């Protein structure tokens, strides 16, 4: 009881916990607000090293931020111009292709064992509605919720502009909402969270770009269909560690089944090689920062996915890093002292 009272009397812990609970409640009630804040934080953390690099070159605070934002908007517009048209062109035929794969049960050409066939049939029967429902959900998300999606994009872009210019003032505000006696502790906590989440987001973005581009290059080089949609799918799913790799490979595997045994083996080998390279890059760039247990990662993805929906799955690991720092800064010292 004495230890519990001691925890409650720790002002830094108490106010941090209070603000976390309030934030989660607001995000649950207003999912669009959650989406805007997630995207703003994501892009701000991506642009941060660009701004710091320009500032080191003595370009000045405002020029560095304007240049970083212009670079961001150019890359975004160019990427959308290059990606969206071919993805929309391929989407309908890709759905038809997936439907034919499941209807024809093409995996029967590869599975000769009568004992294994029922197992694969059950797996594929489970995957078919899940994959179809997800693809239809993504398509309807953009078409039927066009106003909501547009609102999120507009507020994200405006918010990003202000956040990039006033990041120090925003950081100071978060420190000022703590009692004066614990502001130094709060400042150190937010600095550690910013460093851990920033490094993670930049590394996972680099990995996603490497894997997405690799799929596009290989599919284009061998003149394979659906290069745009497969590479975009690989890029997006790789923002979800561990689970995303499985999600990434499901449509790739189904597509490779139509290429024969040699095609299946070559694409599987390519996937293994590119993920091995991405894993090495991830390990090297994440050295010295918070490490997360794979079980903790999976549980975080599941929990925050249930709590906040699709966006929750993508922010599961950054939030897990947040709580890892929270544990190290506030809870562990209190428990160790008792």
From Swiss-Prot:
Subcellular location: Cell membrane
Pfam families: AI-2E_transport
GO cellular component: plasma membrane
Ranges that cross the membrane: 20-40, 68-88, 147-167, 203-223, 239-259, 263-283, 297-317
InterPro entries reported in the protein's UniProt record: AI-2E-like
Protein's GO biological process: transmembrane transport
Main location: membrane
Keywords: Cell membrane, Membrane, Transmembrane, Transmembrane helix, Transport
Protein topology in the membrane: Multi-pass membrane protein
UniProt similarity note: Belongs to the autoinducer-2 exporter (AI-2E) (TC 2.A.86) family.
PANTHER family: PERMEASE PERM-RELATED, TRANSMEMBRANE PROTEIN
Protein name: Putative transport protein TM_1349
Native species: Thermotoga maritima (strain ATCC 43589 / DSM 3109 / JCM 10099 / NBRC 100826 / MSB8)
Lineage: Bacteria, Thermotogati, Thermotogota, Thermotogae, Thermotogales
